[in-house]
């Protein structure tokens, strides 16, 4: 454990940020999984609805720095391609 006051404060802040980031990351993954589940079921309407709910969440996490913008773009591109294949 840290002895210096500022180091103790940073440890507390880091733990708080870690928990917040874990929560946001989990939420984002849940939205992505909903899209994959709809694709697996072969339901294009449900997949589009889930994708439209997921897209702003992923974009927001990229802007906030939780994930890289290229990772957000990759998720969206891959899911869009899979949804378009459903016909």
From Swiss-Prot:
The keyword Glycoprotein does not apply. One of its GO terms (cellular component) is cytosol. Residues 1-26 are annotated as: Disordered. One of its GO terms (molecular function) is structural constituent of ribosome. Keywords: Ribonucleoprotein, Ribosomal protein, RNA-binding, rRNA-binding. GO terms for biological process: translation. NCBIfam families: S20 (TIGR00029). Binds directly to 16S ribosomal RNA. Belongs to the bacterial ribosomal protein bS20 family. This is Small ribosomal subunit protein bS20. It comes from Salmonella gallinarum (strain 287/91 / NCTC 13346).
């Amino acid at each position: 454990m840290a002895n210096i006051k500022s180091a103790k404060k940073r440890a507390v802040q880091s733990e708080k940020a870690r928990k917040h980031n874990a929560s946001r990351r989990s939420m984002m993954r849940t939205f992505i999984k909903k899209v994959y589940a709809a694709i697996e079921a072969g339901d294009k309407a449900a997949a589009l609805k889930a994708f439209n709910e997921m897209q702003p969440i992923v974009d927001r996490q990229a802007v906030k720095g939780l994930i890289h913008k290229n990772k957000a773009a990759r998720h969206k591109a891959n899911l869009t391609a899979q949804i378009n294949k459903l016909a």
